[in-house]
Every structure is written in structure tokens, then in C-alpha cells.
């Protein structure tokens, strides 16, 4: 079983993550069954978001009683500290847990930093100090924001689209993350369904140390 360590987080898991966006489209019973089946097959990293309707609720039920055996990453699209705390408390309640392993800013239009006026990064630091989150990450679709986040040294993980149809700029992001000891979580490994050869898609991702692909079951 191939394993991956997400940079300086120290999180080491099976090099297949579970993308929990699609489970919002199926029943609670089916979603819980699917998540538990993935767990039994050796998957330990599960990625969701506050914006994914009831995805967090479904994962919360799936891992109730075995929370310490999985890593859960979720996200907030908050624009200010007040929204951040509201989202975090809701996520913790939905997930039936008192901590999130990786709490990610969800595709912000800018790179949250201390003193930027949004209060977002300061809130994340406070949440980490309180033990409510363990690591601070960011997701994005913009190369400029992703690069700024890596070079800032403020983030422990980056989640970004990455597949075998990615170009040189995406490959450079992976290398930058490695240089900064930052975990790279690869979303859209099948490019939103454009790639149909899953074996080839995985073989591509497996070449890169520190890259964790998350797959969504459609």
C-alpha cells in the first residue's frame, strides 16, 4: 500500500483520499455505508467542506466512535472572523468531533494573512491554539493565490486541481510545496470526469512525493 506524508503536518496516510463532495447527492444510509467501506479498505483521509450541504453530517455518523482512527479535513468559505467561528462550530457539531485535523480556507479570492483586515488567519491561529483545529490549510483554483500561500509559509497544506492533463505551472506548484515542506492535496484527479482511465490517473499522482489525491465517487 503506497503511503504519503503531508509535509510538516506529519499526517501519513494511504495515498488515496476520499473526496466527500459527491456524497451530498446520495442518501444518508448510502453515504455512511460508502465512507465506512472506504475506511475498511484502508482509506484514512476524508475531505469535506461546510459548503457541501450535508456531507459533514454523513461523515460524522460514519466515523462516530472511531474518530481517532481517521483524518478529517474540512473547509470554510468565511469572509471574516465572525463567519469563521460560526462555520467551525457548525462543522464540529456536524462531524461529531471536538477537533478538525486540517481546516482549510475554501477557494478564497486572496491569501488570508495576519493583519490583512479580514481577521481570518488570526481566527485560525486562535482555533489551533484552542485545539479545535490541528493544521491550517488553503484550497484554491488560482495559481497566483496558491503560489502566494506556499511562499508565505503560513499554511501546512495546499489543495489544488492536479491530474495528468495538468501543465508546467501546476507541476511547479507541487515542487514549491515540496521545497516548503507543505502537503499537496490533489483535487480533480480525474479532471471532473474528463479522464476515464482511473489506473493511469492514479499512476500519475503516485509519482509525486507529498501529493495526496482525493477521489470523489460519482
Locations of regions flagged by a protein language model:
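N-terminal binding-site loop/beta-alpha segment at the start of enzyme catalytic domains
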Residues: 1-70
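Structural preference for beta-strand elements that scaffold enzyme active sites
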Residues: 3-5, 13-17, 44-45, 69-73, ...
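Glycine/proline-rich, positively charged
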Residues: 26-29, 36, 79-193
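Conserved short secondary-structure transition element at the edge of the structured enzyme core
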Residues: 39, 128, 152, 182-186, ...
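Short beta->alpha linker loops
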Residues: 50, 54, 76-79, 140-144, ...
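Active-site phosphate/pyrophosphate- and oxyanion-stabilizing loops and adjacent acidic/basic residues
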Residues: 57-61, 89, 147, 202-203
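Short low-complexity, flexible loop/linker segments enriched in glycine and/or proline
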Residues: 61-63, 151-153, 173-175, 199-203
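N-terminal glycine-rich cofactor-binding segment that shapes the pocket for flavin-like pterin cofactors
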Residues: 65-76, 83
Amino acid at each position: 500500500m503506497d503511503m504519503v506524508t503531508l509535509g510538516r503536518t506529519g499526517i501519513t496516510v494511504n495515498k488515496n483520499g476520499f473526496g466527500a463532495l459527491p456524497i451530498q447527492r446520495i442518501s444518508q444510509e448510502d453515504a455512511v455505508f460508502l465512507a465506512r467501506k472506504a475506511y475498511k479498505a484502508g482509506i484514512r483521509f476524508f475531505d469535506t467542506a461546510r459548503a457541501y450541504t450535508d456531507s459533514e453530517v454523513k461523515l460524522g455518523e460514519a466515523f462516530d466512535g472511531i474518530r481517532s482512527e481517521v483524518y478529517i479535513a474540512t473547509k470554510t468559505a468565511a469572509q471574516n472572523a465572525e463567519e469563521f467561528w460560526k462555520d467551525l462550530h457548525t462543522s464540529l457539531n456536524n462531524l461529531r468531533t471536538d477537533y478538525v485535523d486540517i481546516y482549510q480556507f475554501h477557494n478564497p479570492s486572496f491569501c488570508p494573512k495576519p493583519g490583512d483586515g479580514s481577521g481570518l488567519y488570526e481566527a485560525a491561529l486562535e482555533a489551533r491554539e484552542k485545539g479545535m483545529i490541528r493544521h491550517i490549510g488553503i484550497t484554491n483554483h488560482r495559481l497566483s493565490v496558491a503560489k502566494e500561500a506556499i511562499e508565505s509559509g503560513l499554511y501546512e497544506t495546499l489543495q489544488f486541481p492536479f491530474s495528468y492533463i495538468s501543465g508546467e505551472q501546476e507541476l511547479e506548484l507541487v515542487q514549491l510545496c515540496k521545497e516548503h515542506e507543505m502537503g499537496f492535496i490533489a483535487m480533480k484527479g480525474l479532471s471532473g470526469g474528463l479522464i476515464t482511465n482511473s489506473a493511469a490517473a492514479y499512476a500519475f499522482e503516485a509519482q509525486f512525493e507529498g501529493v495526496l489525491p482525493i477521489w470523489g465517487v460519482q
